[in-house]
């Protein structure tokens, strides 16, 4: 059926963005990952760390809300591992360049672990869906109201956008790929 094909397509598109993040992080040092590559010329070109963290955060918060579960940020110890100097409810999509620069890691393993957990959460959620629930309204604060399918497409599109930005950021750092 067409609706099941839509779920399979969402899973495929989501997995492609994770593969791009893996390529963007391949061989990168912690210092390179934490660097905003063009802070004076283009301060909104964020670091690899911020792009990965933000994407994981969006997948985590949006899918957890849809699933009615706590975030993996809270339940898998990521909050403690990152120990960011930002409020736990920081609206990362509204970060200034100065706030984005505060998202740094001392261990790339922590960053990759959060990405992996967020992608695993989203993928498991998608696999568990039935086509009948895609048209369920999940947010009435928008006009028109947002369906489950639209919310999922939005967060997966965000992941695709930021994974592409991560590859570009890698190149701005002078790294191949």
What are the roles of these predicted feature ranges?
Residues 1-4:
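Short, Lys/Arg-enriched N-terminal segments with co-localized hydrophobic residues
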Residues 6-10:
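Short Lys/Arg-rich basic patches
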Residues 11-25, 33-94, 137-177:
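Short, contiguous alpha-helical
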Residues 19, 23, 27, 61, ...:
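A generic structural signal for well-ordered alpha-helical segments enriched in polar/charged residues
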Residues 28-31, 129-132, 169:
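A short secondary-structure junction motif
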Residues 85-135, 153:
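Acidic/histidine-rich alpha-helical segments that form the ligand environment
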